[in-house]
Amino acid sequence: MIISILTLFPEMFAGPFGSSIIKRARERGLVDIELFDIRDFSPNRHRTVDDTPYGGGGGMVMRPEPIRRALDHLLERGRGGGTVVLLCPQGRRFDQDSARALAAAGKLVLICGHYEGVDERVREDVDLEISVGDFVVTGGEIPAMLVVDAVCRLVPGVLGEPGGAEDDSFAGGLLEYPQYTRPRDYLGRDVPEVLLSGHHGEIERWRRQEALLRTLVRRPDLIDAARMEAGDRELLAQLARRLKELGLV
């Protein structure tokens, strides 16, 4: 996986990309991440990358030339040709399906927006605009870190466990089932007996039921689009009746 990030603040990425899973993925050559300072592609000696908006208004707008020159540089370096993404509040909401699509692309270019945004002509040159939520942050750097982390987890070999990514929340459209570890008894709260039984079939059934229940209670909006297995719809109906009887829905 080749990921190129165009940013005004490359130093922000040192911590997140130099530790944990992403660090190991880079060291093993599974993910190639390179940062490019947009100021290096400014057409003037002052390294200017922004200007006042035509028509007036507050704030500054990122100029199109430095970003275009940076994209051309990526093509010359063999890092172009992939999916070009602009991180901005107006983009499509990022989710697990988005992460899967970007991971499948093989090459990814992330443009971190800043100030009041980018010149509209930059938007015309990208393949996709992504937002990480209905809120505004200072720039696209932190959203880019989030996108890279979610995408890298889906690259084959990055996670230690072969099925690790498949068990995560949202992987099948559902929230993940509850997880437990030692001690068996903690402040009077015991680990469910089924998890100690050694009966893998019963454990899988319990986990599926808990994933359905947790999604139904916490994120019912996910249910319709989730990938359902045999018997899931009937189980959901039973769970919904139980919750209604308990006055929880």
From Swiss-Prot:
Which of UniProt's keywords are assigned here? Cytoplasm, Methyltransferase, S-adenosyl-L-methionine, Transferase, tRNA processing
Q: Do you know which PANTHER family this protein is assigned to? A: TRNA (GUANINE-N(1)-)-METHYLTRANSFERASE
Do you know which InterPro entries this protein is assigned to?
Answer: Alpha/beta_knot_MTases, tRNA_m1G_MeTrfase_C_sf, tRNA_m1G_MeTrfase_TrmD, tRNA_m1G_MTases_N, tRNA_MeTrfase_TRMD/TRM10
Q: Name one Pfam family in it.
A: tRNA_m1G_MT
Q: Which gene encodes it?
A: trmD
Q: What does this protein do?
A: Specifically methylates guanosine-37 in various tRNAs.
Which family is it part of? Belongs to the RNA methyltransferase TrmD family.
Recorded GO molecular functions are: tRNA (guanine(37)-N1)-methyltransferase activity
Return the GO cellular component terms, semicolon-separated: cytosol
What this protein catalyses is: guanosine(37) in tRNA + S-adenosyl-L-methionine = N(1)-methylguanosine(37) in tRNA + S-adenosyl-L-homocysteine + H(+)
* EC number of this enzyme: 2.1.1.228
Broadest EC class assigned to this enzyme: transferase
Q: Where does S-adenosyl-L-methionine bind?
A: 113, 132-137
**Matching HAMAP family, A to Z?**
TrmD
* Gene3D superfamilies the record matches: 3.40.1280.10, tRNA(m1g37)methyltransferase, domain 2
Q: What is this protein called?
A: tRNA (guanine-N(1)-)-methyltransferase
Give its localization: Cytoplasm
Origin: domain of life = Bacteria
Which GO BP terms sit in this record?
Answer: tRNA N1-guanine methylation
Q: Which NCBIfam families match?
A: PRK00026.1, trmD
Subunit (UniProt): Homodimer.
